Amino acid sequence: MSQSENKPPKTIASLGEFGLIDHLTRSIKIHHSSTIKGVGDDAAVLYDPNRQLLVTTDMLIEGVHFDLSYMPLKHLGYKSVMANLSDIYAMNGEATQITVSFAISNRFPLEAVEELYQGIKTAADLYQVDVVGGDTTSSTRGLIISITALGWAMPEKITYRNGANPNDLLVLTGDIGAAYLGLQVLEREKQVFQANPNNQPDLSDYTYLIERQLKPEARKDIVKLLADLEVVPNAMIDVSDGLSSEIMHLCKHSKVGCNLYEDKIPLDPQVIRTCEEFNLDSTTIALSGGEDYELLFALSQKDYAKIKGNPHLTVIGHFTEAREGIHIITREHTKIPLKAMGWNSFSE
């Protein structure tokens, strides 16, 4: 028997905190010159002489934000990165670095942590961001992930929530509602499996919805597209908590009103078909769903010609004076006050 066969398998306990960090981060690649020092010291060192630093943090908690009965750990790692990068792109910035912290209970073997981190590293490599630090600790209950994303932008290109003006166009990237419906499909199949473990789910009719829920993509491509079109939005936000909530955030911060047109909301055919199957209203799903990670922005009318006909961008409404309020115009041309219907972490 060889010496290697006599070695006990590595575990989280045998590695310890610092050994685990070394084990997980040994293959990390550095993509940016702004990363002066990454993993391995007391703090990362970042520097860019011309651009301003953008910082955002998101936390994901097992049982609140994800269910490991149908969320693969690799996908969870990937999605946790996307949620943070999306916020940087919503500021019209370039995401360049992340820090990764997690608390994990002793029910998870080392292989599970490796799978989680593989998803994080896959996202980091694909989106060209540097993992520059983080922390690990034990948890008495489940899994907690906290990622901080850092990015940079020229001061004149940074897009806040508070710049929308009356008569600006309301523009949405991609389509919405699919992530929420993907969650509904997975929850339904979970209940079916619990009732009959021998029942194997057939998810072939819901591939787009499930991918949008389990493995979303942040819209880095839109930031590049806007730069190529020489367009700087007046205000922007990512659609993580539902379209209606995000519109209301833009209006509140910009002190404007808005008219959203129901018939302009972009929906994938799979969303429409699944809403019919589940007896759900597709507009309600679009307004309240969340986790789409699309970008929603205010655009000056003078820039409309630059985006006209672009398949990635849809004009779904326009901003008004604040006194006119925030409304959705239905397909029947009825004007209805819009209410915030999105995700709330503190709802009971």
What are these regions (language model features)?
Residues 1-72, 100, 348:
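Extreme N-terminal cap/leader segments of soluble proteins
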Residues 2-19, 23-29, 107-130, 140-145, ...:
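Glycine-/charge-enriched secondary-structure boundary and capping motifs
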Residues 33-37, 215, 285-288:
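Short Gly/Pro-enriched turn/cap motifs at secondary-structure boundaries
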Residues 45, 84, 92, 131, ...:
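Residue-level signal for inorganic ion chemistry
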Residues 60, 96-189, 318:
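Glycine-rich anion-binding loops of enzyme active sites
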Residues 182-199, 203:
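Short, compositionally biased
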